[in-house]
Amino acid sequence: MLVFAGAAMMLASCGETSMKVETLDTAVNEALMAGREDSLHVVISLEYPVANISDEVRKAICDSISMIAFGQDYAGLDLKEAAGKWSADYVRTYHNECEETLKLYEGNGDIPMSSELNRERYKTGYFTETYKNIASYTYEEYFYEGGAHGSTVETALNFDLESGKVITEAEFFKPGYEEKLAEALMAHLREAVPDQESYDTMFTHEIKPNGNFTVSEQGVTYIYNQYEIAPYSMGAIHVSVPWDEIRDLIRE
């Protein structure tokens, strides 16, 4: 079953611009087949701009959100269309792959564990904070495709509210920023991981800028995903550096 629901309108403060946003909510709950408990669960919740910015900027931002959530195969569709088509395609793939797996088990006289044929995908996107004319957007995706546990990946996008373009790390910082920014991130790593035992289990303490960052009035925050610098159990690690420490690294 596929359900679309338009969330209530809200205001996102973006510097001098008040950008109206809405949330696209989609849910899919699909049983693999009658008589079995295996199922597919999909939840999509994506904030996107709807007003108080130019149509060109709005479309550029929505296209970037659609691209990161659904991929190139759904380019050119608006968010609702992309969410619907992606969901339908994912349901079809689920049935094709898992029904074939079930047949293989049955052909060998085996009974698969229910977890092997369960699937979950949660796609969540939301605007966080702003800095000058830049609005940060965080996209989180959780996926489970059998096995011991699922995985979550966080990806940040930074939108120029004058053009709708995604600003990359190399475009935001001045050339040669890498070493000084890495030093600042390492200096604040312990604040992000205050527990000594957790700190000791990290893969490395020599972290570097990875292009995955958000901005706010307070500073910049880098996101390090599961397994990137620490074990899965620690989840994503967010390291923040105040502007006062890195202002000379930023392009004006």
What is the predicted role of each segment?
Residues 1-12:
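Sec-dependent bacterial lipoprotein signal peptides
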Residues 14-252:
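Compositionally biased intrinsically disordered regions enriched in Thr/Gly
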